[in-house]
Design a protein with these regions (language model features):
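Short helix-capping/linker segments at secondary-structure and domain boundaries
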Residues: 53, 118-122, 154-161, 260-268, ...
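A generic secondary-structure signal for well-formed alpha-helical elements
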Residues: 81, 88, 116-119, 157, ...
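Short catalytic-loop micro-motif centered on adjacent basic/acidic residues
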Residues: 95-98, 161, 239
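Conserved nucleotide- and phosphate/pyrophosphate-binding catalytic cores
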Residues: 168, 174-340
């Protein structure tokens, strides 16, 4: 998230949106979707479309600080749009768009940078953390929080969902908004962070946090044979088949609990504690439940892929709505600072 479908509905829909709070979520255009980032980020983000006017920004400008392969970036942008739409983002209820389809945001970032105190941004946790991980120190990386502030302010965002590690970005955004308001008059509303509740870490097949970089992921839209192979390779202990097993320490049980009903979870827990069932059988049960749970999303994804213009149409409609909002805000900004 900014971590972070489609405005331009009916006339009634647009009037209705005016009275709703605006929620902005930023989405990093990263790689293949797996179970960990679905439950950790995607599902809670999509749920926001029922709470207000939800905007979902695919942060391709931000991605340029780390991605140097243009073909990979283009593919990732389309993939993340496809996956969000397949997993339930509704373009009749929310607005999905590419960052770069609203170029005014870079103009606002420059204007904000002219009042941004150097000391404030030198203390940015994310900048220090990325340098510590070996990311090259570039001006773009240093200015990342200014662009993020522009992302938030240009849409008159009321709420920005973030993890605890990104709360500082919202505080910096508010600081810049206050600075601009004190200098040039009331231009910006002050966005409020919504600190996302800590989601339980989704374990990978080796028991560590599921991550593509660890090679322990189970992909949602992968091949059935490969998905089964991944599930069947989940690391387990050496407890004999007949002996009771501890569900609390089982990757199998933790993953099953994400997709099964309360009754199904209770039944598996009982079988773990009773003994008499081997891990292999539990893995088979887990695979079947995972495959069943994501089946509607796989079908929806195939439908979208069958319509070659659908993603482009959705992103174009989203860009139109996002630009309508951004144009109104930038008109205020330019007049306030003397550019018009």
């Amino acid at each position: 998230m900014l971590i972070e479908s489609f405005g331009i509905h009916s006339t009634f829909g647009i009037r209705h949106l005016v009275s709703l709070m605006r929620i902005l979520s930023g989405i990093q255009p990263s790689g293949v979707l797996h179970i960990g980032n679905y439950f950790g980020m995607m599902r809670p983000a999509i749920a926001l479309q029922t709470e207000g006017e939800a905007l979902y920004l695919i942060a391709d400008y931000h991605a340029l600080t780390s991605v140097r392969d243009p073909e990979a970036l283009r593919a990732n942008i389309r993939r993340v749009a496809l996956d969000f739409l397949a997993c339930g983002l509704d373009p009749e209820r929310a607005t999905l768009f590419r960052h770069s389809d609203v170029p005014q945001v870079t103009e606002l970032a420059w204007i904000l940078s002219t009042v941004a105190p150097m000391g404030l941004f030198e203390r940015a946790h994310s900048y220090k953390d990325k340098l510590a991980r070996g990311v090259a120190a570039t001006v773009g990386l240093f200015n990342y929080p200014v662009l993020m502030a522009a992302d938030i302010l240009i849409y008159d965002s009321d709420i920005v969902p973030v993890g605890k590690d990104q709360k500082q970005h919202i505080e910096m955004t508010r600081d810049l908004a206050v600075k601009m308001n004190e200098t040039f008059g009331q231009i910006f509303k002050l966005p409020e962070p919504r600190i996302q509740p800590a989601t339980e870490t989704v374990p990978g097949i080796d028991g560590q946090k599921m991550s593509k970089s660890y090679g322990n992921n189970i992909d949602i839209f992968g091949d059935e044979k490969e998905a089964r192979k991944r599930v069947m390779s989940i690391v387990t202990d050496s407890t004999p088949v007949d002996a009771p097993k501890d569900p609390a320490n089982s990757t199998i049980f933790k993953l099953y609990s994400l997709v099964a009903s309360k009754n199904e979870i209770a039944e598996m827990r009982e079988r773990f504690l009773k003994g008499g069932t081997g891990y292999g059988d539990f893995k088979k049960q887990l695979f079947e439940k995972l495959w069943e749970y994501f089946a509607p999303m796989r079908r929806r994804r195939e439908e979208i892929l069958g319509d070659k213009s659908y993603i482009d149409d959705v992103l174009a409609r989203g860009a139109q709505r996002a630009n309508e909002i951004a144009d109104r805000v930038m008109k205020r900004v330019r007049e306030a600072v003397g550019l018009r």
